[in-house]
Amino acid sequence: IVLPEFEKSLKDILPLCAFGLVGEGSECYGYDDELSQDHDFGPSVCIWLRKDDYLKYKDRINEALKNLPKTYLGFQELKESEWGNNRRGLLNIDDFYFKFIGSANPPQTINNWQKIPETALATVTNGEVFIDNLGEFTKIREQLLNYYPEAIRQNKIATRLMNISQHGQYNYIRCLRRNDLVAANQCLYLFVDEVMHLVFLLNRRYKIFYKWANRALLDLKILGNEIHKLLEDMVFAQNKIPYVRKICKVLADELRNQKLTNCESEFLGDLGVDIQKNIDDEFFKNYSPWLD
């Protein structure tokens, strides 16, 4: 319903526009369900223009958008919550990217990459661009979708391995032996979060917001379904230690399969150290595997 309106009353602006659904909100990942309908739910679209075009044409475009039908396929138009404003409708490209990555341009240095939260990179590259007549929005998007430079990815993998081994293979078991169940559950949560993160890295995909990370595993080709099943089974198991060990073995096998390490140790921290010291970058080679 938006495109026909542009073709009718905003035909001169149409060549400057990109249309899509990208950014915050579970609908951008395709994860909306009945529970999602209690806030920020309804038919919506993002319309992106360059900053100068946005300032020049925003009044005309917003006036045209006001005249669109208030329902679509039986659904009411988007009702924004207090925290859901400025996600949809008319947006300018510079501000959209700056909101998530702190710049209107893709990162060019290791330091710039490290400053951007990974969940922000996931958010700014999710969803779909339906039409990009000018190509400006997609040009930046594609550079971000090309993923981290390999040295950064390997450093992040090494850090995940250090944390997985610390939380799951070491501290979880020690906390259980001390009968400190609160601390043990803290360890288990941290273990699960780092395991999920590692699977995203092995798939060269940015890790998404924690609430949807488990669901997103099902969309990842490398170990996604297997790790999802092991984590689900572990949650319901009385004795979780065998699952911790199995998960670590599966991850170690995949790391060796991807030729990231040839270390045969069962302790993932050893693999993390090995990967870090073999990164083909002088800065990262001497960087702590505990840091990313």
Regions found by a protein language model. Give the residues of each.
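Active-site nucleotide-donor binding segment shared across nucleotidyl transfer reactions
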Residues: 6-52
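N-terminal regions immediately upstream of nucleotidyltransferase
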Residues: 1-4
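Conserved NTP/Mg2+-binding pocket subregion across the NTase superfamily
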Residues: 55-176
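Conserved nucleotidyltransferase catalytic core and NTase-mimicking acidic/glycine-rich helix/loop elements
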Residues: 119-285, 291
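A generic structural motif
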Residues: 49-54, 178-182
